[in-house]
Amino acid sequence: MTSDALTIGRYTFTSRLFVGTGKYKDLDETRRALEASGAEVVTVALRRVNLKERGEGSMMSLLQQGRVTILPNTAGCYTVEDAVRTCRLARELGLSDLVKLEVIGDERTLFPDNEATLEAARILVKEGFTVLPYCMDDPIVCRKLEDIGCAAVMPLAAPIGSGLGIRNPYNLMIIRETAKVPVIVDAGVGTASDAAVAMELGCDGVLMNTAIAGARDPILMAQAMKDAVRAGRMAYLAGRMPKKLYATASSPEQGKIAAL
């Protein structure tokens, strides 16, 4: 498994678990959860974190000490203009060109606005950003985002923060089958089995926040998610046995003891 690296644009990672930084009770819990997860990519909502504050005790200081790749995101943006402006600000403040693009279309469900996401992605790719767009689990939208030049696609498994798990595994399978860029499941994971299923379907990674931060023991859940993502990836590479309607004996007929 050491050679099974994940490459997104010019970036390469050994961990396929991406995590967020919101909803923890304090910075110490955030730090311990991040360490337990083994994640190398940590996403930060630019609207909720002061990027200029980098002194001791700040979120940015914590992330820099952890030597992780910071993935700024545009959570809370409802227009193309806001999302693009937020990404430009992140780059101006010294963060990398790697961005998680979110353009929300509905306040209640937090579903993405597909048209706005495509438009914003087109602008950002032209400006040299490595764009990872949050999108619906729609194979057509994912294909269009890939055609624009996005370095990965991030279809949701279920609404953000819902914990409902993988609601449409078949769409994710189609996306994975047709996409030539990494597919990172983003949103909806509730527990370790959800993460394992996403990876078993062939997805290249999983991004989560509430599933860890909202657990009764976030540190233990972070460890569980780390193991689940790795186990799911290994199972996908190993190839599961075919499903059958009827039983198949695991012991051969030869050598069966005859009746006395």
UniProtKB/Swiss-Prot annotation:
Q: Please tell me the species this chain comes from.
A: Sorangium cellulosum (strain So ce56)
Where primarily located? cytoplasm
Q: Which residues form the active site?
A: K100 (schiff-base intermediate with dxp)
- CDD domains listed in its UniProt record: ThiG (cd04728)
Q: Which gene encodes it?
A: thiG
EC number, as in UniProt: 2.8.1.10
Q: Which residues cross the membrane?
A: none
Tell me the protein's name: Thiazole synthase
Q: Enumerate the catalysed reactions.
A: [ThiS sulfur-carrier protein]-C-terminal-Gly-aminoethanethioate + 2-iminoacetate + 1-deoxy-D-xylulose 5-phosphate = [ThiS sulfur-carrier protein]-C-terminal Gly-Gly + 2-[(2R,5Z)-2-carboxy-4-methylthiazol-5(2H)-ylidene]ethyl phosphate + 2 H2O + H(+)
